[in-house]
Amino acid sequence: MDLEARVKKMGLGHEQGFGAPCLKCKEKCEGFELHFWRKICRNCKCGQEEHDVLLSNEEDRKVGKLFEDTKYTTLIAKLKSDGIPMYKRNVMILTNPVAAKKNISINTVTYEWAPPVHNQALARQYMQMLPKEKQPVAGSEGAQYRKKQLAKQLPAHDQDPSKCHELTPREVKEMEQFVKKYKNEALGVGDVKLPQEMDTQGPNRIYIPGGDRSTAAAVGAMEDKSAEQKGTQYSCYCCKLSMKEGDPAVYAERAGYDKLWHPACFVCSACSELLVDMIYFWKNGKLYCGRHYCDSEKPRCAGCDELIFSNEYTQAENQNWHLKHFCCFDCDNILAGEIYVMVNDKPVCKPCYVKNHAVVCQGCHNAIDPEVQRVTYNNFSWHASTECFLCSCCSKCLIGQKFMPVEGMVFCSVECKKMMS
């Protein structure tokens, strides 16, 4: 791809969702404007998933690319126009007759995603076993939850070098090898089946004693298959509780079909969120979402949210950073060798801290420098100096002394408090 085409593609990416309102900040945000490399809105600092952006096509392209060159190509279709793989997510529409007095109306429910099984009754049962707030019914809280989890669990920049910020050719090659490896070794999609249909063997199949099997009648007779199934219990690999007879279970091929999960238990072992569209990554006996699987393999930059493929990076505040991305969260100035303050786990340079975040002294009403000592009581602060931390009545210095706080004022004695009341 030539330079002009790459710049055009980057521009189109930054136009995606431009101006969309923030669902979290409401009117405080002027509208979505993607930061050049942070994956957040420049105006309100929230992620794109927090904004009312129509991303269905973009998300289908992302998941389609994830399944490309894997055994899950049946879940994608390539567009004739540009050959880009698109995720063929299964949309389920249910029509339920609803009696209203004498008239009968039709209530239609559309699920933006449903497990790709031929038995719609099984898919319906699966959905009913999910928490209501996580059922992806179109226009509901559950649909919004699915949208957020697609963005959070399967970041496009964890699989597509073109979605990353200025990777070197060596980093691009290393990332492509990493993606190929996890597609071959970890990526999977859950299957929804009835446990009784599976010839399951292993620790999740528990036989209940059904009498003395050593009798002559038992030794010579053929066992009735249905009776055997009734004498079998299946336990969830996550919660260890038994499955109810007739309830669907989720299987993960990479884990082996001796393991099964309740639909609501098929979650990431790191974040405990429902694995979106049952897309999982299997490692060391645990299920992961895409994000946390990658986190277990590579350091992630706390600035741009991308995986780090460079040999050189920095660590600060128990987080990892590209050298070029260890910047002030407010002004983007590089912080190497500079004084900074952590604000909500984000580094902020000293000038921006004083301007935007510093607490104000109740004595002099000026911002308190982060390197200066201060006295704090409840939500009020003072410079720890003889000029500021004084009795609000007689101006006696209160450093090291007992004091009486009253609505932002401090007094050295009951008498001074009474004089000001």
Curated annotation (Swiss-Prot):
Function: Scaffold protein that may play a role in cell adhesion, cell spreading and in the reorganization of the actin cytoskeleton. Plays a role in the regulation of cell proliferation. May act as a tumor suppressor.
InterPro entries: LIM1_Testin, LIM2_Testin, LIM3_Testin, PET_domain, PET_testin, Pk/Esn/Tes, Znf_LIM
Domain (PET): residue spans on this chain: 92-199
Main location: cytoplasm
The name this protein goes by in its record: Testin
Matches recorded under SUPFAM superfamilies: Glucocorticoid receptor-like (DNA-binding domain)
Pfam families listed in its UniProt record: LIM, PET
Gene it is expressed from: TES
Domain remarks: The N-terminal and the C-terminal halves of the protein can associate with each other, thereby hindering interactions with ZYX.
GO BP: any one term: negative regulation of cell population proliferation
GO cellular component: cytoplasm; focal adhesion
Keywords: Cell junction, Cytoplasm, LIM domain, Metal-binding, Repeat, Zinc
Places the protein is found: Cytoplasm; Cell junction, Focal adhesion
The LIM zinc-binding domain, residue ranges: 234-297, 299-359, 362-421
Family as reported in the entry's similarity comment: Belongs to the prickle / espinas / testin family.
Residues annotated as signal peptide: none
Organism: Loxodonta africana
GO molecular function (one): zinc ion binding
